Structures are given as C-alpha cells and as structure tokens.
C-alpha cells in the first residue's frame, strides 16, 4: 500500500470564542467560563446538546455542524461514504504535507514532524457520544501496488487497471485477497465443504458447486441466499441490473467479504483503500474503553501523528462494499 493523500473530516463549523468547561460537557450549572480542563471534566462545545441527544446523527444534520463532513446524506436520507462524500473532505497530497514547514527546524535526525493546518475545537459531551460522525478525524488514501512477491493474477490486475467496469473485482476474505469471483470459488472449493470459507461463498447448497474449466461448465450454488448464487444471477445473467448487483454485494459483505473495485481518481488509476484515524486528545490508555474527552480537538494544543506501519488493507471506496462500514 502506498499512501498518497490525507484528508481532514468533521471539523466543527462553530465554536466558543472563550473556552468553557463543565462536569458534563453541557451548558449546565457546573459550567465555568475560561475554566481549566482536567482529566475528569469536559470542554463545552456550542452544539453540545445536539451531540448529547444524538440529534445530529438521527436527523442527518452533519452539514449544519461540520465543515468537511465524513459522509454524505442522499435524497433518500441514506448516509454513506463514497465519491460525493470524499469531495466534501479537506484533502491534501501527503508529499505536499511532508514538504511543509517543519515542527522543529533545529532537529537534524530522521522522522521529524511537519505542520499541516489549524483545526477548530470539537468536543463531545460523554464517552458514548464519541462517534465517527461527530469526532474530528484524518483519512488516508492508499493505493494498492504490486511487489516482487505479488501473485501474477493480482499483479496484472493492479498494474493494468483502467478504472472501468471491465477491470477485475478484488475480494478480501480472512486476510487473503482474490482476483475475480472465479478465483474465490476455486479456493473455496479447495478448502472443502466443512470449511467456513466454503460456507461463506456457497452457503448451504443442495447441489454440488463446480469450478469452470475448459472442459467443464461452472455449477453455481443453488442456495438463493449465498453470494455465489447471487453473483451468478448478476454477473452471468444480468450484468446491468443494479438491484442484482446490490443483492450480491449485500450477501458478500454479509459473509465478511470486502470488495475492492478500481477507479479513476483525479490523478491516477488503480485500486484504492482508506484508513481512518480519530483525533485522540485525552488518552485514557485503555483501547477498549473510551474516557472523557478522549476523542476531541481542543484549542491551544498541537496534535502529532506518525504512520509507521501498515498491517492490513483499508476500507473500500464505497460503504456498500464494506462488511464493517463506518
């Protein structure tokens, strides 16, 4: 994965000119103007009550409260991350950020930080209210690239992508990446009937699925709920049917497949994935439990972030292709 771009999302569009703190994060009897933030209280935001009662999320009112909202709400009220949402983000090339002013010009070693931009205050009242749609974050866009160890079929797909519907669709399952559904079927059949991979692909068919060869026609699962059955109905019988495609994607992601499709971005063509980081303000040291003001942006703070390693593929371009969407 080659990280190419980074984007700021969910930056507050309103904020108090003077900091306020309270025990609850709300404008209640405990609020103190110009008060000191502690490990147990909260900075009070202008829209604290709307964040507390969840009305920003339930009412899809993100654009009323944030610049660069993470997701887009369509005419049917569906929130998702796709091309329209990404056009809302504040996006920069990572190379430009790394060429920006150094945080410590006197530093002569490796790995110095560079200044990106100012971000307005964004605090959320309560631990459980700290959600993806409300907290300020950074999104990294990565491009899949081939290495010397990349299998031939995957290397061909990555290096010859045109960003059209004719490009191979990649499927990730259990940390393995497959090129085309035919390859998924082939490996699932090798795993055998009792395997979880077999069931994820074929469901519980009454027939015996068969892989296509030069001498044998493919036999697809007759389990009408399985991804294999629905892929055949879409891809082989009605490729232009959006409803059939959606049904297949829903079944595939429901079986924990992540779907990656090529695209033409503004400056290149390829297969892209996305990594999300939520700005951590008051780290409680427990990754499994959120603490007060853990995910927030507070004035007069400098937040530093370093990407040192990538361990897995990121989220796909579109929410409908993601078994674990934000």
Residue ranges and their predicted role:
Residues 280-326:
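C-terminal or late-domain output modules
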Residues 2-299:
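Tryptophan-paired
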């Amino acid at each position: 994965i080659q990280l190419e771009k980074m984007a700021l999302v969910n930056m507050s569009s309103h904020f108090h000119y003077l900091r306020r703190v309270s025990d609850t994060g709300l404008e209640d009897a405990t609020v103190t103007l110009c008060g000191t933030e502690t490990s147990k209280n909260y900075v009070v935001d202008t829209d604290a009550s709307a964040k507390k009662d969840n009305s920003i999320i339930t009412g899809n009112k993100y654009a009323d409260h944030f610049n660069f909202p993470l997701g887009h709400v369509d005419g049917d009220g569906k929130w998702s991350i796709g091309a329209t949402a990404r056009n809302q983000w504040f996006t920069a090339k990572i190379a430009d950020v790394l060429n920006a002013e150094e945080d410590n010009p006197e530093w002569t070693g490796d790995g110095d930080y560079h200044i990106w931009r100012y971000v307005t205050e964004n605090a959320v009242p309560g631990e459980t209210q700290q959600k993806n749609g409300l907290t300020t974050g950074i999104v990294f866009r990565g491009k899949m690239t081939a290495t010397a160890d990349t299998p031939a079929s995957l290397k061909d797909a990555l290096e010859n992508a045109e960003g059209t519907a004719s490009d191979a669709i990649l499927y990730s399952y259990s940390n393995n990446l497959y090129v085309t559904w035919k390859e998924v079927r082939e490996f699932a059949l090798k795993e055998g009937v009792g395997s979880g991979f077999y069931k994820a692909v074929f469901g519980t068919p009454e027939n015996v699925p068969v892989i296509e060869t030069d001498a044998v026609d493919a036999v697809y699962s007759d389990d009408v709920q399985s991804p294999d059955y629905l892929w055949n109905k879409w891809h082989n019988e009605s490729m232009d049917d959006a409803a059939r495609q959606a049904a297949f994607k829903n079944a595939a992601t429901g079986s924990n497949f992540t779907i990656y499709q090529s695209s033409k971005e503004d400056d290149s063509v390829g297969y892209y994935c996305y990594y999300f980081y939520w700005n951590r303000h008051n780290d409680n040291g427990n990754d499994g439990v959120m603490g007060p003001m853990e995910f927030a942006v507070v004035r007069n703070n400098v937040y530093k972030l370093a990407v040192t390693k990538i361990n897995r593929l990121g989220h796909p371009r579109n929410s409908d292709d993601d078994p674990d969407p934000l």
